[in-house]
Structures are given as C-alpha cells and as structure tokens.
C-alpha cells in the first residue's frame, strides 16, 4: 500500500492532555479519536493502544509518549498523551513534545489533586501558552453544585499560576460515555474540540520569527572568507543581509555574502535548513561553535537565568549521588557546553532546597561564566564530564 500523503491544507497545532493520574487523560484522548472518527477526521485509537505507548529516547532520557493525530473542521492536530507522571515531567522539560496548548483533564469526582497542580506549574514554567479544561467523569456526579464548586476551585488554581482562570473554557465531559457512543456525551467532545479550536491560538510559524542560526562549525575558504555552518533554527536569511554574531564574546555585526547548502549557492536559507553562511570581514578566529548568528538586535546574551530542571536517575545514566547549591556543571546550550554554577534550588512553594537527588524535578538559578544567547523557553542539558545528568528549560532570564 502506498503511504498516505500528508495534506497540508489546514493549520497544524500541537497539543496534549495533562492532569492527575487516573483522572481520565488517556480515556479522553481515545474518546476524541472515536468521536472525530465518525466524521472521518481521525482514526479510532482505543485506550490500550494509547496506554501502551512505546518508549522513546530524547537526549538520553527514556520517555513513554503516545502520539495521536486528528483534525477538526479548521485544524490538524498532533496530540500527545503520557502514561505516567514522570513521563510528563520529562516530556515537558525536554521539549520532546512541544505543546502549543494543552487540555487539562480534571475529574469532577475528585477535583484538582497534587499532579493537577504540578502539571499547571510545569505548563507555566515551560511556556505552554494556553489551556482548556476538560472536567471529566461528569456522568458520575449528579449534584450540579459539586460540579460548580470544582469548577471554581480549578479557576482559582489556574489564576494562582498566572493563567487567565476566569476566561479559560471548562467543558463538562465523560470520556467513557463518549466512547460508549452516548449522544449527549459525544456532543460534549465536539464542544471540547470547539473550545480547543477557538481558545488555543495558532502558533507563529518558525519561518516568520526573526532569524537565528547556532554555529556548529567554522571554516575558512581561501579567497572567499569565513563560512559558519549550522541549522537555521528560525526565520530566514538572504545574501546581502546584515546579521549579528552573539554570545561568548562581544557581539559584532557583519554581512552575509553567500548562503550555501550542499555546496550549491542559495538565494536564501530558511528555518530547518542546514547551511553555510559566508561572512564578510570575519576571521576564522573571530567565531566559534556556540555563538549564534541572528537578526541584529533580536537577541542579547545573558549569564543569569532561572530554569526548571529534571535531574536524571541513576538508571537513566545520571548521577548516583545528590548535589548541592554551588555545584558547577557544564550547561549544554544549543551547540556547546558552557561552564556555569547552580547558585540556588527552589521548591514548588518557593522555599530553598539544600540538596537535589537524582529523579527530582526542581527550579534552579544558574550563572554562566560567559554570556550566551539564552532565551525564555529554551531547552538545555546539564552535563558533567560529557554525560547528561539533567535536562532543563529556561523559565526566566535574570541578567
């Protein structure tokens, strides 16, 4: 059978289900596929298929994730669902599953629980821009007042983590009853998908953002000058444009005198391309791996930041022993290791943490020895002697 061609006639959005264990994330995911399948917009996937997600490795960390795709009238969605709580933590921090928005699943029978809170905090820290709430298992609650109380509690919780709690849609659903084909609950899944369509904004495409390419290698070509190679992370670059070299040393501007890919000249390089940029008046010594080439003024180098970090367990190849504030690892940022120091660890409630154990999910403050182009929402790894011992995301730039 010939492979189906991916039709790109609708905008594409990445979403996922988050929330407390046993509140019905996977059942709801299965319900979305079963309801949309009746309109020919999805392939039915049952609970067992989604729950038995294969292991994936992202930066050496093992994560179980199920990927489901479906479409609504206006959009194409890629949806991720994770079987275990630890998988969510790792997934969101490593950015293995980049989410443009998420469906927060909360059972009406329980209300918000510990992991409901932790997932909302994580979503905030890693920069998930928008949430929609699916209040699940509503078929099991007869008392309308209880449902109202749970909704109020969820709204207050969302607001306490700086999400617009009063405006986020909360849709009463029953994943199980929708799968069983009960019409009123199938209609609720449609209502949920309408809320997702309207409340989760379409992501800005990488190509429309300001140009950035991290330098992987530098060559000098006799008679032509210096070429920096790498993958264009976002935006585009044309021959003749001015760019800025940022990070490690003082920023400086130069002009791109050529863009080449596979030894052929291009008019312009686009997001996703691996290419070489020929730079005017730059010596090979002026530029090194770890610097970035950017649209002038679009990014400034920083040394101090806050990050949300997952510390690998011993079984994942991480450390066997705890570490403390003052620890000096390498931070692997884009294409290079930069030495830095972790000056403080903070718990969820804002209190200081003395000791961090393998397997922890923690907020840290880091300081690098030289300024690098770091940005909010950017992923990094923490390494020690060349092996990864943690994965993190920049939650805030300090200086």
From Swiss-Prot:
InterPro entries: EF-Tu_GTP-bd, EF-Tu_GTPase, EFTu-like_2, EFTU_2, G_TR_CS, P-loop_NTPase, Small_GTP-bd, T_Tr_GTP-bd_dom. Residues 174-176 are annotated as: G5. It is found in: Cytoplasm. Mg(2+) binds at residue 26. Residues 60-64 are annotated as: G2. It comes from the Bacteria. GTP binds at residues 19-26, 81-85, 136-139. It holds the Pfam family GTP_EFTU. Residues 136-139 are annotated as: G4. The keyword Hydrolase applies. GO terms for molecular function: GTP binding; GTPase activity; translation elongation factor activity. GO terms for cellular component: cytosol. Keywords: Cytoplasm, Elongation factor, GTP-binding, Hydrolase, Magnesium, Metal-binding, Nucleotide-binding, Protein biosynthesis. Residues 19-26 are annotated as: G1. Its EC number is 3.6.5.3. The keyword Protein biosynthesis applies. It catalyses: GTP + H2O = GDP + phosphate + H(+). Belongs to the TRAFAC class translation factor GTPase superfamily. Classic translation factor GTPase family. EF-Tu/EF-1A subfamily. GTP hydrolase that promotes the GTP-dependent binding of aminoacyl-tRNA to the A-site of ribosomes during protein biosynthesis. Monomer. This is Elongation factor Tu.
